Structure formats: C-alpha cells, structure tokens
Swiss-Prot record:
The nucleosome is a histone octamer containing two molecules each of H2A, H2B, H3 and H4 assembled in one H3-H4 heterotetramer and two H2A-H2B heterodimers. The octamer wraps approximately 147 bp of DNA. InterPro entries: CENP-T/H4_C, Histone-fold, Histone_H4, Histone_H4_CS, TAF_TATA-bd_Histone-like_dom. This is Histone H4. It is found in: Nucleus; Chromosome. One of its GO terms (cellular component) is nucleosome. SMART domains: H4, TAF. Residues 1-14 have a biased composition (Gly residues). Residues 1-20 are annotated as: Disordered. Belongs to the histone H4 family. The sequence of H41 is shown. The lineage of its organism: Eukaryota, Amoebozoa, Evosea, Eumycetozoa, Myxogastria. PROSITE patterns: HISTONE_H4. CDD domains: HFD_H4 (cd22912).
C-alpha cells in the first residue's frame, strides 16, 4: 500500500477529465423577490432599491467563507464529497452553530 489508508485510491492513470462549464455571474440567480422574501421573514416592511446588490455581495462573501472551510474539512478527511457535517463544522468554526443536521 502507498500509505493512503483504506481503498487503493491514487492508483492507476486516472480516467478522462470531463469538461466543466465555467460558472460566471450566478449570484444574479438570487432574485429580487427571493431577497425580498428573506427580508420579510426578518421583519422588514420596506426595502430600498440599493439593498439587492449589497445583499448579493454580502451573501457571496459569506458563502465563499463557509464553502472554503467546508472543503478544507473534506480534503483533510481525504474525501471528494462535502457532507452536511462539513458545513456544520465550518459554520461552528465561524461562530454560527447550526443545530439539526447531526453531530
């Protein structure tokens, strides 16, 4: 074995690489009505027009940080699939404990 633990991972030449579409500007998929619904849930009555782009920016930054931490946990465990627990631990690390998803 090559010191990789269980399974013979890392052996062979590897398969063909698939082309993956480059994702750009997907933050616009967070629509104005979706942001409005989130604000309503938070108790907001009126929403300024400038809020939508600002909210998208803040959400993008937040998700980048959480996903970066979750992927770090995944890589440390030598897995290729990010689990719900990886996200829970990533949120806990940032001081935002989330209950109800195991652990």
């Amino acid at each position: 074995m090559s010191g990789r633990g269980k399974g013979g991972k890392g052996l062979g030449k590897g398969g063909a690489k698939r082309h993956r579409k480059v994702l750009r500007d997907n933050i616009q998929g967070i629509t104005k009505p979706a942001i409005r619904r989130l604000a309503r849930r938070g108790g907001v009555k009126r929403i300024s027009n400038t809020i939508y782009e600002e909210t998208r920016g803040v959400l993008k930054t937040f998700l980048e940080n959480v996903i970066r931490d979750a992927v770090t946990y995944t890589e440390h465990a030598r897995r290729k699939t990010v689990t719900a627990m990886d996200v829970v631990y990533a949120l806990k690390r940032q001081g935002r404990t989330l209950y109800g998803f195991g652990g």
